[in-house]
Design a protein with these regions (language model features):
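Hydrophobic/aromatic residues in well-formed alpha-helices
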Residues: 61, 227, 303-306
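Flexible mid-to-C-terminal extensions adjoining Fe-S/redox cofactors in radical SAM and related proteins
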Residues: 18, 23, 264-266, 283-359
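Conserved alpha-helical substructure of the radical SAM core
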Residues: 2-128, 340-341, 348, 352-359
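Conserved residues at the C-terminal ends of beta-strands
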Residues: 45, 79, 132, 198, ...
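Residue-level marker for beta-strand->alpha-helix junctions and adjacent short loops that shape enzyme
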Residues: 34, 49, 83, 111, ...
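The −1 position to Zn-ligating cysteines in a subset of zinc-ribbon hairpins
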Residues: 34, 38, 268, 324
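Radical SAM enzyme [4Fe-4S]-AdoMet core and its adjacent flexible, acidic
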Residues: 122-128, 132-285, 289-298
Length: 359
């Protein structure tokens, strides 16, 4: 992370902690819900065509980026679906990372990244890739993702290293790949990659008139106590593991929710206030993209007005008191909440930086 990003974060942390002014620490723009893979734990392949057709235009996304920058956000990630399916991705990266000097990441399966690098050089403005890798072996990873992508992941890592772009491997831990976690960490280390290792989760995606649920996901989820003890053990041997002890404890103790007693007292969910999520169609969901109870059209309303609205603030103040928060163990929700508290910030990001994983 660049020094100016740390300074911007400290400014936002101070304002959020000691004043009535609130600023999200990070933002995500879901560029598309289209995907070229078919992972067994993901609902995107189930999405209907009429939903896919409502993607924001290039200019609409740029307008959102402008407002995210004006709001004072420190970092922005482009996700999907598969964001590399958008032909304007290099243009959007440049607009956000170069024009607005935001710290920029892209979450991708890697299938199209070699082509993007070769056609666009360095991809100016891009700081890091969050790259999916579930197995250290080609056949198993390709089978799980539903496309022949392993070789392209390896090529993406090589090209990113040549361009001084940080690569964070994202491993979804399932019963089948659990026994290969050491080999995955060894591969990540040999490739100069950091790695995030969270268990598979049953993600229900709610839309206004439709709920998408992947059947039999529970059959994929590993034993969480075994996962936790394995991560603790592996962290002793691999400094490139980003999955920190506090995140592990939050997952192991039941995740978010459990109001009024709560499943754990380590960390409340701060996603609604700390992480601004913009949907592919320009709507912003509160408290989160998984279970929106209030959605605002950011193509019609100013971003600052949405974020600072009374309705949004009331949802923020409830954190994970909602019934649907029960046992939420999403790695993205945990990581997005951690900058809101000094102790958790230190565990995840400061120690990650000192261990060399976030430089």
């Amino acid at each position: 992370m660049r020094a100016k990003n740390w300074l911007r974060y400290l400014k936002n942390f101070t304002l959020n902690k000691f004043t009535s002014k609130k600023i999200p620490y990070s933002a995500q723009i879901e560029l598309t819900i289209r995907c070229n893979a078919s992972c067994p734990f993901c609902s995107f392949p189930m999405m209907e065509e009429n939903a896919i057709s409502r993607e924001m235009s290039t200019q609409q996304v740029k307008s959102i980026i402008d407002q995210i920058s004006q709001l004072g956000v420190n970092s922005l990630s482009f996700t999907g679906g598969e964001p590399t399916l958008r032909s304007d991705l290099p243009e959007l990266i440049h607009h956000a990372g170069v024009k607005h000097d935001l710290m920029i990441g892209v979450a991708t399966n890697g299938y199209l990244m070699p082509k993007l690098f070769k056609e666009n050089g360095k991809l100016n403005g891009l700081d890091y890739l969050l790259l999916s890798l579930d197995y250290p072996f080609k056949e198993q990873h390709d089978r799980t993702r539903g496309i022949k992508v392993f070789d392209r992941v390896m090529e993406t890592i090589k090209l990113a290293n040549q361009r001084d772009i940080k690569v964070i491997l994202s491993t979804v831990v399932m019963k089948e790949n659990f026994k290969y976690l050491r080999e995955i960490c060894e591969l990540a280390e040999s490739l100069n990659c950091s790695i995030e290792i969270f268990p598979c989760e049953n993600i229900i995606r709610d839309f206004p008139n439709k709920r998408y649920i992947v059947k039999n996901v529970d059959n994929l989820i590993p034993d969480l106590s075994m996962w936790a003890s394995t991560i603790d053990y592996l962290r002793k041997d691999f400094k490139n593991i980003l999955t920190d002890p506090i995140s592990v404890a939050v997952v192991q103790r039941g995740g978010f929710g459990g109001y009024p007693k709560y499943n754990q007292e380590i960390l409340r969910c701060h996603v609604a206030e700390a992480y601004l999520f913009v949907r592919y169609d320009g709507f912003i969901d509160f408290p989160c993209k998984i279970h929106p109870i209030k959605s605002f059209n950011a193509l019609k309303l100013p971003l600052s007005k949405i974020y600072n609205s009374l309705e949004a603030r009331e949802i923020m103040n409830k954190h994970d008191d909602f019934e649907f928060c029960e046992e939420c163990r999403l790695g993205c929700a945990i990581a997005s909440s951690m900058p809101a508290r000094w102790k958790t910030l230190a565990s995840k990001f400061i120690m990650g930086y000192l261990r060399g994983n976030l430089k």
